């Protein structure tokens, strides 16, 4: 085997009429008029190779089939004018020597039709799927993003520290993946859902600024933007307030987009309170590439003819284009799936309305038209009831309309914003108790600390913030509690006894007593961010070896049974269903 002269994608005008040696995979072979035409591919690009019948390379080239590994030596030259398509397609290699480096079985699917192949087949043969240029571009984009993150944070004085992968099971929201300890029978480690406590301990230890591309594990239901094992870009800073954290994050994200995509994100990012996001868009991660904010018409219907709205705590309306009855029925299905009892509607006709609940709104039609600005033929969609249920359901309808009419197409490619001032606590109807909205180490606004233990503790605002892009939460963080007394009040508010808190978090509570600095941080969902940056439809497209939506690795066939002897060693017995 000879040493290659370059990657295929490095060839260009400067290499014209030079002898080159290339190595890669045969994407395609064509036989035409006695000539053999090959497309040779490596990670950087594809080039056409022509083998003439009188060439000493012909016999060896005749052995080549799809996905064979080959070494080609020949002259790099322009293709005939009529065959040029721009870039590398303007050139070809006239082969003088061909060597088959390895044969290949016929692939189970055509690589150039990969996106039309069932995903389970692609995942089973992931090593072949990853040969596709689209997949290689996605993973190279990921590598560039890691480099951009590292160079920025290193320059800003952050220190990269690795935290444990085997740790203690603590309540963090999702189920833990548990690992039995062979040396301590009956006891278990947990794989980390996040490095939350360890990064706070690093601030207590005096490291001032920390970051890590952390592997995290959560045993939860999966969807397009979730995996059981995933990557967070985790960061923490000492002696900071909320604005300090947000300012660094804005510059970091702008740097990543500039270096990786050559896209300038406008700074600073707009901020919106949790209440405003929910009240106007029905989501704590609103897609702001398009507006379509709700209008509150509670007062307009109060005491009116339509009983369902007359006494409703909240009535919200969303303006939509003209809709067919079939489309309205589909949107009503979306609303019901998200907690609404139904989806009332009206269609504007002149200075009034037809359809839906039109017989109940004759007297308020002018006010509805004025307040909503609905166009002729346009549709009004209503949700009514308890505030959070109403706005959440209408928020789901808003996103369905976005997809139906491609409403985001008219906005920026990327819209980034902050959602701030989340509630510190939320009331769980099932358990009839208060619980944390983010995690129990989130600090409340200083002016709200006095509300702990009072009837108004549900009004407390957290110093928590989410970074939102195109309707996805790509990061979330908070200023942390650094005062042991405030931490005790937080545990008390969520029903954690002192004994329970000690059992779960004793090591951390001890550390808080040894001079904890004010600190705050954030974690990015790195896979989710890369999904958005690359335009992929799923985070599985930006992860080299992902699980499917059932949490299975179809290539490695994991999870899988293990030997009884292995289970016995760690004291585990599998029960039947």
Curated annotation (Swiss-Prot):
PROSITE patterns linked: AA_TRNA_LIGASE_II
GO process terms (BP): aspartyl-tRNA aminoacylation
Keywords of this entry: Aminoacyl-tRNA synthetase, ATP-binding, Cytoplasm, Ligase, Nucleotide-binding, Protein biosynthesis
Location, primary (coarse class): cytoplasm
GO CC term (a single one): cytoplasm
Domain of life of the source: Bacteria
Enzyme category, top tier: ligase
This enzyme's EC code(s): 6.1.1.12
Catalytic activity from the UniProt record: tRNA(Asp) + L-aspartate + ATP = L-aspartyl-tRNA(Asp) + AMP + diphosphate
Region Aspartate, residue ranges: 196-199
InterPro entries (UniProt xref): Aa-tRNA-synt_II, aa-tRNA-synth_II, aa-tRNA-synth_II/BPL/LPL, Asp-tRNA-ligase_1, Asp-tRNA-ligase_1_N, Asp/Asn-tRNA-synth_IIb, AspRS_core, GAD-like_sf
GO MF entries: aspartate-tRNA ligase activity; ATP binding; nucleic acid binding
Residues given in the record as ATP binding sites: 218-220, 227, 473, 525-528
UniProt subcellular location: Cytoplasm
Role description: Catalyzes the attachment of L-aspartate to tRNA(Asp) in a two-step reaction: L-aspartate is first activated by ATP to form Asp-AMP and then transferred to the acceptor end of tRNA(Asp). Is specific for tRNA(Asp) since it cannot aspartylate tRNA(Asn).
NCBIfam families the record matches: aspS_bact (TIGR00459), PRK00476.1 (NF001750)
Protein family (similarity comment): Belongs to the class-II aminoacyl-tRNA synthetase family. Type 1 subfamily.
The protein's assembly and partners: Homodimer.
Protein name: Aspartate--tRNA(Asp) ligase
UniProt source species: Deinococcus radiodurans (strain ATCC 13939 / DSM 20539 / JCM 16871 / CCUG 27074 / LMG 4051 / NBRC 15346 / NCIMB 9279 / VKM B-1422 / R1)
């Amino acid at each position: 085997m000879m040493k290659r002269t370059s990657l295929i994608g490095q060839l260009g005008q400067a290499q014209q009429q030079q002898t080159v040696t290339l190595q890669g995979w045969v994407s395609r072979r064509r036989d035409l008029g006695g000539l053999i035409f090959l497309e040779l591919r490596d990670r950087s690009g594809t080039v056409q190779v022509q083998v003439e019948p009188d060439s000493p390379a012909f016999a060896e080239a005749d052995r080549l089939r799809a996905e064979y590994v080959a070494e080609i030596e020949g002259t790099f030259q322009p293709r005939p004018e009529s065959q040029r398509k721009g870039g590398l397609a303007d050139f070809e290699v006239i082969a003088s020597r061909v060597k088959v480096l390895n044969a290949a079985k016929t692939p189970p699917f055509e690589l150039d039709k990969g996106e039309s192949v069932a995903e389970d087949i692609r995942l089973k043969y992931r090593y072949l799927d990853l040969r596709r240029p689209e997949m290689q571009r996605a993973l190279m984009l990921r590598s560039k993003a890691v480099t951009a993150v590292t160079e920025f944070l290193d320059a800003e004085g952050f220190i990269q520290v690795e935290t444990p992968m085997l740790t203690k099971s603590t309540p963090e929201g999702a189920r833990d993946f548990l690992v039995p300890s062979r040396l301590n029978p009956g006891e278990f480690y947990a794989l980390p859902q996040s490095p939350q406590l360890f990064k706070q301990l690093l601030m207590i230890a005096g490291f001032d600024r920390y970051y890590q591309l952390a592997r995290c594990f959560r045993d939860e239901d999966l969807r397009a933007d979730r995996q059981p094992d995933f990557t967070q870009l985790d960061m923490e800073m000492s002696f900071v307030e909320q604005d300090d954290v947000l300012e660094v994050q804005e510059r970091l994200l702008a740097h990543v987009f500039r270096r990786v995509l050559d896209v300038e994100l406008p700074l600073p990012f707009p901020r919106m309170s949790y209440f405003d996001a929910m009240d106007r868009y029905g989501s704590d991660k609103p897609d702001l590439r398009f507006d379509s904010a709700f209008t509150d018409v509670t007062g307009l219907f109060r005491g009116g003819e339509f009983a369902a709205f007359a006494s409703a705590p909240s009535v919200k309306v969303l303006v939509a284009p003209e809709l067919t009855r079939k489309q309205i029925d589909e949107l009503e299905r979306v609303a019901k799936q998200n907690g609404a009892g139904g989806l009332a509607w009206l269609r504007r006709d002149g200075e009034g309305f037809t359809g839906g609940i039109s017989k109940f709104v004759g007297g308020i039609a002018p006010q509805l038209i004025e307040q909503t600005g609905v166009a002729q033929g346009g549709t009004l969609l209503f949700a009514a009831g308890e505030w959070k249920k109403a706005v959440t359901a209408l928020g789901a309808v808003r996103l369905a309309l976005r997809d139906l009419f491609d409403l985001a197409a008219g906005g920026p490619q990327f819209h980034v914003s902050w959602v701030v001032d989340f509630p510190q606590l939320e009331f769980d109807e099932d358990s009839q108790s208060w619980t944390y909205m983010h995690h129990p180490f989130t600090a409340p606004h200083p002016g709200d600390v006095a509300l702990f233990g009072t009837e108004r503790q549900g009004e407390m605002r957290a110093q928590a913030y989410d970074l939102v892009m195109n309707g996805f939460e790509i990061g979330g963080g908070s200023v942390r509690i650094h005062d042991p007394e405030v931490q005790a009040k937080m545990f008390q508010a969520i029903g954690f006894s002192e004994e329970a808190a000690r059992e779960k978090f004793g090591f951390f509570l001890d550390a808080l007593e040894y001079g904890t600095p004010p600190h705050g941080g954030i974690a990015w969902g790195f896979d989710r961010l890369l999904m958005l940056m690359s335009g992929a439809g799923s985070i599985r497209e930006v992860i080299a070896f992902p699980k499917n939506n059932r949490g299975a690795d179809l290539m490695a066939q994991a999870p899988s049974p293990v030997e009884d002897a292995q289970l016995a060693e760690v004291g585990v017995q599998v029960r039947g269903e």
